[in-house]
């Protein structure tokens, strides 16, 4: 088993930034990401409140730029689901669904996940009437009534984006 200097849990903006910086300082790093580089921000219609964002940039283009920078920097990334973390001892251990990793340091950059409504049948209807990615799924709802459930400016921003498709 290879022992890393740093294990980073999460491939969103924070995790990728930490990985790029650590590699630039000569550290042996692995980023563990369960789905895709960019995390949740990769699914938003327009990215705001991040340094270096191009005006009107979508979440998917931002995530693609993160992935390109991560690859160009030589950051190692694996797509696995973390199941257990032990931070005891000199070497920390991270167990995933595909293997075990050890490092002197662990950075938690695990981000966020969309909140569920908690209504019966919600999980079964994702992709068949319930969407969680306005930028990627909005056109699928063209000419239909669209309801947005969420809080703060993020929900308003997505509702404004989806208005172009709604009845």
Label the predicted regions.
Residues 12, 37, 46, 81, ...:
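A generic "binding-loop/recognition-motif" signal
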Residues 3-4, 8-34, 126, 133-167:
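Rossmann-like dinucleotide/flavin-binding elements
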Residues 31-43:
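N-terminal glycine-rich anion-binding loops that anchor highly charged ligand groups
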Residues 42-100:
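N-terminal Rossmann-like dinucleotide/flavin-binding domain of flavoprotein oxidoreductases
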Residues 71-78, 108, 164-167:
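Generic secondary-structure signature for well-ordered alpha-helical cores
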Residues 1-9, 25, 76-144:
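FAD-binding core/adjacent interface of flavoenzyme oxidoreductases
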Residues 39, 117, 157:
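Alpha-helical elements of the RecA-like P-loop NTPase motor core of helicases
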């Amino acid at each position: 088993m290879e022992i890393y200097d740093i294990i980073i849990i999460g491939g969103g903006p924070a995790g990728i930034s930490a990985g790029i910086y650590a590699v630039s300082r000569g550290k042996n790093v692995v980023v563990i990401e369960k789905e895709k580089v960019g995390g949740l921000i990769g699914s938003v219609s327009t990215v705001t409140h991040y340094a270096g964002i191009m005006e009107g940039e979508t979440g998917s283009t931002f995530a693609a730029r993160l992935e390109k920078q991560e690859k160009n920097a030589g950051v190692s990334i694996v797509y696995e689901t973390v199941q257990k973390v032990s931070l005891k001892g000199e070497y920390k251990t991270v167990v995933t669904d595909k293997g075990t990793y050890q490092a002197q340091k662990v950075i938690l950059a695990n981000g966020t996940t969309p909140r569920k409504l908690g209504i019966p049948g919600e999980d079964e209807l994702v992709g068949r009437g319930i969407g969680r990615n306005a930028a990627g799924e909005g056109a699928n709802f063209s000419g239909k009534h669209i309801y947005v459930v969420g809080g703060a400016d993020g929900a308003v921003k997505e509702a404004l984006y989806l208005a172009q498709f709604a009845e």
